């Protein structure tokens, strides 16, 4: 898995959208945003003990599969547009890439997009309340296992949702410390120039 800050171009969403020069984002930075990641053996997902361990520890007791491509997904154009609309969920979004590749974009505390490139074997968890979106890359294909705790619910809440209790929890748990540091830094700069 690789991640980087996106440029502001409105070009094809399937392009990498690197800044110039590229600004890569570490796994540690993603973890600060609540993003979890594992690299697993996608060819043996049915019997992989590591996947079973993760599922048991995190309570992922339901799975289904999705293939995202113009040929495989009914109402492809409508669905890919919906996936790319900035939104949040009240539950984690858990995806295990079994084949192909695609991008999950997530907002950082300063509201900048971070693009996360997932490929075969990558399992990613986006935290509940995080603003994010998904698109295929230029390969135009992804097969993923979707995991859920309990009954599968995939209800997107399009931005803005800042008053939603789950969004507030996400801000308090993952963004508040960073935002407080920015406020202190700005206050210090303002005091120094006054």
Curated annotation (Swiss-Prot):
Co-factor(s): Fe(2+); Ni(2+)
SUPFAM superfamilies: RmlC-like cupins (SSF51182)
Binding site for Ni(2+): 87, 89, 93, 132
Lineage: superkingdom: Eukaryota
Cofactor note: Binds either 1 Fe or Ni cation per monomer. Iron-binding promotes an acireductone dioxygenase reaction producing 2-keto-4-methylthiobutyrate, while nickel-binding promotes an acireductone dioxygenase reaction producing 3-(methylsulfanyl)propanoate.
Catalytic reactions on record: 1,2-dihydroxy-5-(methylsulfanyl)pent-1-en-3-one + O2 = 4-methylsulfanyl-2-oxobutanoate + formate + 2 H(+); 1,2-dihydroxy-5-(methylsulfanyl)pent-1-en-3-one + O2 = 3-(methylsulfanyl)propanoate + CO + formate + 2 H(+)
EC number: 1.13.11.54, 1.13.11.53
Region annotated Disordered, chain positions: 1-21
Record: residues binding Fe(2+): 87, 89, 93, 132
Pfam families in the record: ARD
Pathway(s) per entry: Amino-acid biosynthesis; L-methionine biosynthesis via salvage pathway; L-methionine from S-methyl-5-thio-alpha-D-ribose 1-phosphate: step 5/6
UniProt keyword list: Amino-acid biosynthesis, Cytoplasm, Dioxygenase, Iron, Metal-binding, Methionine biosynthesis, Nickel, Nucleus, Oxidoreductase
Cellular component aspect of the GO annotation: cytoplasm; nucleus
GO molecular function: acireductone dioxygenase (Ni2+-requiring) activity; acireductone dioxygenase [iron(II)-requiring] activity; iron ion binding; nickel cation binding
InterPro entries the UniProt entry points to: ARD, ARD_euk, RmlC-like_jellyroll, RmlC_Cupin_sf
Task of the protein: Catalyzes 2 different reactions between oxygen and the acireductone 1,2-dihydroxy-3-keto-5-methylthiopentene (DHK-MTPene) depending upon the metal bound in the active site. Fe-containing acireductone dioxygenase (Fe-ARD) produces formate and 2-keto-4-methylthiobutyrate (KMTB), the alpha-ketoacid precursor of methionine in the methionine recycle pathway. Ni-containing acireductone dioxygenase (Ni-ARD) produces methylthiopropionate, carbon monoxide and formate, and does not lie on the methionine recycle pathway.
Recorded family membership: Belongs to the acireductone dioxygenase (ARD) family.
Record protein name field: Acireductone dioxygenase 1
């Amino acid at each position: 898995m690789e991640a980087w800050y996106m440029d502001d171009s409105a070009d094809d969403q399937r392009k990498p959208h690197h800044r110039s020069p590229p600004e890569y984002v570490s796994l540690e930075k993603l973890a600060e945003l609540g993003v979890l990641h594992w690299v697993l053996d996608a060819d043996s997902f049915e019997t992989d003990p590591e996947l079973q361990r993760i599922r048991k520890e995190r309570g992922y007791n339901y799975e289904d599969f999705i293939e995202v491509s113009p040929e495989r997904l009914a109402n492809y154009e409508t669905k890919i547009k919906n996936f790319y609309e900035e939104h949040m969920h009240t539950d984690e979004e858990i995806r295990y890439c079994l084949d192909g590749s695609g991008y999950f974009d997530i907002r950082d505390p300063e509201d900048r997009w971070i693009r996360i490139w997932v490929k075969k074997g990558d399992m990613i968890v986006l935290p509940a309340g995080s603003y994010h979106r998904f698109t295929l890359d230029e390969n135009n294909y992804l097969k993923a296992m979707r995991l859920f705790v309990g009954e599968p619910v995939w209800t997107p809440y399009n931005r803005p949702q800042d008053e939603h209790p789950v969004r507030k929890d996400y801000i308090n748990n993952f963004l508040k410390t960073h935002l407080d540091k920015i406020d202190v830094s700005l206050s210090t700069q303002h005091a120094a120039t006054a």
